[in-house]
Amino acid sequence: MGEVQREKVAVIIGPTAVGKTKLSIDLAKALNGEIISGDSMQIYRTMDIGTAKVTKAEMDGIPHYMIDIKNPEDSFSVAEFQERVRKHIREITERGKLPIIVGGTGLYIQSVLFDYQFTDDAGDVIYREQMEKLALERGVEYVHKKLQEVDPESAERIHANNVRRVIRALEIFHMTGEKMSDQIEKQEKELLYDVSLIGLTMDREMLYDRINLRVDLMMEQGLLEEVEGLYNRGIRDCQSIQAIGYKEIYDYFENRASLEDAVSQLKTNSRRYAKRQLTWFRNKMDVTWFDVTDGEKTSEILRYIEGKLQVKSNNSK
């Protein structure tokens, strides 16, 4: 029997503010593609400005998926993301189109492309509740330290403030005796799709300037009012509010920071996030990088995808 033909997928990754949105739409037009957002926060409705969500005008008629599918108070997991995106890939391919995943949330994108398996069981609820209680009583750093003791690699990757994921890693070790980082390493070996993995990068100072300008533009567009709307709805300890762009402005509404300091912190956190994104992609994924410091590389990237996936663009007919 011949080898089963794998579905073709183009993936565009890179740090925040590097120019992924425009490139993805240009490529979708040229390659008869449809776009799947690979951003873990653009799934939330009414959180448009702070997540730099693509607008209807920017979409220019290109179908987009995994945007506005949850309310801000809803939780969302990597496992659900994986399941939904794989379904979209299948359906887009069946329509004779090319799925194009665009985004910056490394683990989410990786979970789709590789053989990541998430347990369906509820886990150890009693153990999880014990850890949640410890986090409340003794602080998140205490629970993070427990993870460092049993799984230092996961502790390095998961920030102490991401309590849910810290506890999940502890729970996996408690239940299986196996480190979450070891499980992930096993699952990172084989791609499930025929993938063209494109990364955009640019001069760091230029990128940081773009990030600072983007934050200023967000404030002009009404980020303060957007966050105030969420705050007034009583949305507090939700996964969505941990997003950069929201937690900083929440500090202002809760009188923990002046507006000037909150905006400054937002810029700092965005720059740090961009740096972490680049580190993740370089360490974890086999990316072909294109430096866009001196301008767009759309034609060059298009030619690369055509060769890698053996597809034809509208331009090459």
From Swiss-Prot:
A Pfam family assignment: IPPT
Family statement drawn from the similarity comment of this UniProt entry: Belongs to the IPP transferase family.
GO molecular function, one term: ATP binding
Ranges where the record places region Interaction with substrate tRNA: 39-42
EC nos: 2.5.1.75
Keywords: ATP-binding, Magnesium, Nucleotide-binding, Transferase, tRNA processing
Annotated positions binding substrate: 16-21
Cofactor: Mg(2+)
InterPro entries: Dimethylallyltransferase, IPT, P-loop_NTPase
Binding site for ATP: 14-21
Functional summary from the UniProt entry: Catalyzes the transfer of a dimethylallyl group onto the adenine at position 37 in tRNAs that read codons beginning with uridine, leading to the formation of N6-(dimethylallyl)adenosine (i(6)A).
The species this protein was found in: Bacillus cereus (strain B4264)
Keyword Electron transport set for record: no
Single biological process term from Gene Ontology: tRNA modification
Reaction it catalyzes: adenosine(37) in tRNA + dimethylallyl diphosphate = N(6)-dimethylallyladenosine(37) in tRNA + diphosphate
Keyword Lipid metabolism in annotation: no
Official protein name in the record: tRNA dimethylallyltransferase
